[in-house]
């Protein structure tokens, strides 16, 4: 049996494909965390070792720069004194100082009023200054945008028709309305692909075998999940190659949740042993 286990999220949607093997063994086929907000653009600056690739901080004309390489671009790095909102609140004497500092031509025309000087400085910054790259917030994404992104990401799973079972974390919190909607979107996507073996499972299941009824905080459960995952990988010949991947990943907890959820499902069906 091959299953796809999904830990629901917007910025951190964790997916893990697990296939059962002979002798009650299992193998992880695919494992990742998907950002439905879209990946943050990376720095395009060409270094001696190739393209930088670090997280971008600024951009201009669809070219992205990290904080370090922005200083090597032909454009100005944004400063607080040049922010449009701040300029409109600045005294005319200070505006004249800014114009002089950046050699902004105001034609020596003393008849220009504050609004006209401000517009000249803003025009200058629009042409000469880098623009900050804004981080896409999950809270600002509407469900249609999330649905489009979800579809595009799941379409990348070219072998999805070979998956026998979908296991999705059940969203039960009264404050998780958006997550409940996304859970439904995920299920509907697979239903429309004629994959209808879909189970919604409680998030509490994945650690039951390891901690029983022990009372723990959310943070403690996350930490325990990561440690258990690493321990399972280290002791499993078929999957120990995944250990460096997990150890280096920024979202170890979400990776762990998707794996442990899938393993719980397979153990519950008496298809594997750990």
Regions found by a protein language model. Give the residues of each.
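Phosphate- and other anionic-substrate recognition elements at nucleic-acid/protein interfaces
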Residues: 1-274
């Amino acid at each position: 049996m091959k299953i796809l286990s999904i830990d629901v999220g917007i910025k951190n949607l964790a997916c893990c494909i697990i296939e059962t093997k002979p002798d009650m063994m299992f193998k992880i086929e695919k494992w990742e965390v998907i950002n439905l907000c879209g990946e943050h653009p990376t720095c395009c600056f060409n270094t001696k070792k190739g393209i930088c690739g670090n997280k971008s901080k600024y951009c201009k004309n669809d070219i992205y720069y990290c904080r370090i390489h922005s200083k090597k671009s032909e454009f100005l790095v944004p400063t607080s004194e040049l922010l449009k909102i701040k300029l409109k609140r600045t005294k005319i004497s200070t505006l004249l100082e800014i114009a002089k500092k950046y050699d902004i031509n105001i034609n020596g025309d003393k008849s220009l009023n504050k609004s006209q000087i401000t517009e000249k400085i803003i025009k200058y910054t629009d042409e000469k200054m880098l623009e900050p790259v804004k981080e896409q917030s999950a809270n600002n994404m509407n469900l249609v945008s999330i649905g489009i992104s979800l579809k595009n990401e799941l379409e990348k799973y070219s072998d999805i028709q070979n998956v026998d079972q979908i296991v999705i974390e059940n969203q039960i919190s009264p404050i998780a309305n958006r997550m409940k909607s996304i859970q439904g979107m995920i299920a509907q996507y697979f239903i429309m692909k004629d994959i209808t073996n879909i189970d919604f499972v409680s998030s509490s299941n994945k650690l039951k075998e390891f901690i029983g009824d022990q009372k723990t905080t959310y943070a403690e459960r996350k930490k325990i999940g990561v440690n258990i995952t690493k321990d399972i990988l280290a002791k499993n010949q078929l999957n120990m190659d995944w250990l460096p991947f997990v150890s280096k990943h920024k979202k170890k907890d979400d990776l762990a949740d998707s794996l442990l959820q899938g393993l719980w499902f397979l153990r519950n069906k008496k298809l594997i042993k750990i």
